[in-house]
Every structure is written in structure tokens, then in C-alpha cells.
Swiss-Prot record:
Free-text function comment from the UniProt entry: Aerial growth, conidiation, and dispersal of filamentous fungi in the environment rely upon a capability of their secreting small amphipathic proteins called hydrophobins (HPBs) with low sequence identity. Class I can self-assemble into an outermost layer of rodlet bundles on aerial cell surfaces, conferring cellular hydrophobicity that supports fungal growth, development and dispersal; whereas Class II form highly ordered films at water-air interfaces through intermolecular interactions but contribute nothing to the rodlet structure.
Protein name: Class I hydrophobin 2
Presence of keyword Signal: yes
Subunit structure: Self-assembles to form functional amyloid fibrils called rodlets. Self-assembly into fibrillar rodlets occurs spontaneously at hydrophobic:hydrophilic interfaces and the rodlets further associate laterally to form amphipathic monolayers.
Gene name tied to this protein: hydPt-2
GO MF annotation, one: structural constituent of cell wall
Domain of life, per lineage: Eukaryota
């Protein structure tokens, strides 16, 4: 009787271990070279909206940017995440923008994209 109990436990224990281990969910933030929304952008100019008085008036955006506190990118192009193709070389800080374009040249709500991590 003890032998059959031992064999039963020997058969059940591996199944219990498999159920407990189960599939592993990889958790964490967005990889550093990706954006939560939109695609990575390389803009010719990236500045805080609070520093853009001249930029605002030249694009006629005084009212639109008056209360904003995010980064604004001008003349942005998509960046290839793998470092190849159009926009692979970015002379300014790559950014993720919320794709709120104004006048086709200004991207609002941008955040720096860390490509070194």
C-alpha cells in the first residue's frame, strides 16, 4: 500500500509543479527604442514649449501652445528602430510624439526616446 501511494505521489508531483510554474509572463516597460504611441521621430528641432516664444509666433501657434508644457518637435521624420533606412541618423534627440501635428510641420506632446538603454 505504501508503494502504490509513493507511485501516485511520484506521478502527481510533476504535474503540480508544471501547473504552478505555468507560462511565464514577461513584464516590464516598453523597450527603450519603441514608443507607446506612434513611431519614433527624429525632429530637426526639439524644444520645451516654455522656451518657444519665437517658435510659437513664427508658426502662428501662440494660443495653441500657451498652456502646454511638453516638448515640441519641428520638421520630424520617422526613425528606423533598427538604425537603418530613412532617418537612421538623427542629429537631435529622437522623440516619441503623440502624432498631434499642426500645420504639417510641428509635432506636439513629444517625449525623449532613450536609444542607449
Amino acid at each position: 500500500e505504501i508503494v502504490s501511494l509513493s507511485l501516485s505521489l511520484l506521478a502527481v508531483v510533476p504535474l503540480v509543479v508544471l501547473v504552478i510554474a505555468g507560462p511565464l509572463n514577461v513584464r516590464g516597460g516598453t523597450p527603450s527604442q519603441q514608443c507607446n504611441t506612434g513611431t519614433p521621430q527624429c525632429c530637426q528641432q526639439v524644444q520645451q514649449t516654455s522656451d518657444l516664444q519665437q517658435f510659437r509666433s513664427s508658426f502662428g501657434l501662440v494660443d495653441a501652445l500657451a498652456g502646454a508644457s511638453a516638448l515640441v518637435g519641428a520638421n520630424c521624420n520617422p526613425v528606423s528602430v533598427l538604425g537603418t533606412g530613412n532617418g537612421a541618423q538623427c542629429n537631435t534627440q529622437p522623440v516619441c510624439c503623440t502624432s498631434n501635428q499642426m500645420l504639417g510641420a510641428v509635432n506636439m506632446g513629444c517625449m525623449p526616446l532613450n536609444v542607449n538603454a
